[in-house]
Amino acid sequence: MEQRLALITLGVTDFKKSAKFYLDGLGWKATEDSSNHIIFIQMNGFRLSLYPHSELAADAAVNEDRSNFRGFTLAYNVSTPAQVDRVLDFAVQAGAKLTKPPQKATWGGYSG
């Protein structure tokens, strides 16, 4: 499997405060596809995103309880749904626990 990450998403408890820190405090720039619901920041070779912790837990199909969900996700992007299935199968074979089966996402992609 190719060593690459496309997106690191941080689940934040205070979205406005976090946005202020990253955008105003650090001076990082939000991309044009950011909104008042999610912020994307282009880094060197990947994107960092800020997303409400409760919604990130729901998207990952896990309980929001911080003892089970630490509040971040890593995205490994591929081109087709079949490739997503293969990557998830590979991860499970390597010992990962699949919490959300691959499916069409509300934002238009395919993820698991």
Regions found by a protein language model. Name each.
Residues 1, 88-112:
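Vicinal oxygen chelate
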Residues 43-45, 67-71:
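Short connector loops at helix/strand junctions that flank enzyme active sites
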Residues 9-57:
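Core segments of cupin and vicinal oxygen chelate
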Residues 15, 81-82:
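Residues at or immediately preceding the N-termini of alpha-helices
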Residues 21, 82-89:
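Short amphipathic alpha-helices within nucleic acid-binding modules
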